[in-house]
Amino acid sequence: TFLLEMENRLNSQNIKGEDKDLPIWIPLKTIQNLYQELLESNVEIVVSAKGVKFKEKGFELSFNQLSEGYKNILIWVSDLIYRFQQSQPNISKLHDFKGIVLLDEIELHLHPIWQRRIIGQLRTFFPNIQFVFTTHSPTIIQGASEDAIIYKIFRNPKTGKTSSSEAYFKKNLDHMMLNSLATSPLFGLEDARISCKTNSVDTSD
């Protein structure tokens, strides 16, 4: 796994000392702390010679026993860090990584509370990375930063071409409740009531 590879590389660095040919790697403890923050400290991550284990409410779990939300976050965040360490090998702190990251439907398998927090958490840990998200969740929009710019992407039914709306600015949406945001032109939900029924749904946006 990514964490075990991190540990092996760090041990290799310690053995070889000040070898300038070795790339700098983010400390394993820093990565673990990042995961703990993203997982809301509900899961303890234990790295040992036997592998990586997770402890939740006193129970020891394998990776496959974690919830889909936890697994999803761990997989793509690990992949993100790994790719940045490969492309920027002399960076030793997470907040120094620079680049652009595209994430499709970040809300998948996440509880609404987590959806609202996740973008702010990522911005805190990676302030020099520009994140571009796609989402179908108004809760993700609620959690976006004040300087976020939002576009509605849609397919023109006449031409079949994909287009975008004019820009929405997050700071101009802060007054809206979640149900108001869902029924706004940005999402186009016809009615926010639970009992509302509709005969047709346009999912092309």
Residue ranges with predicted function:
Residues T1-Q36, N179, T183-G188, K197:
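Coupling/switch segment of ABC-type P-loop NTPase heads
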Residues P23-I31, E37-L39, K53-Q65:
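Accessory N-terminal region flanking or inserted into the helicase ATPase core
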Residues V43-V47:
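Short beta-strand
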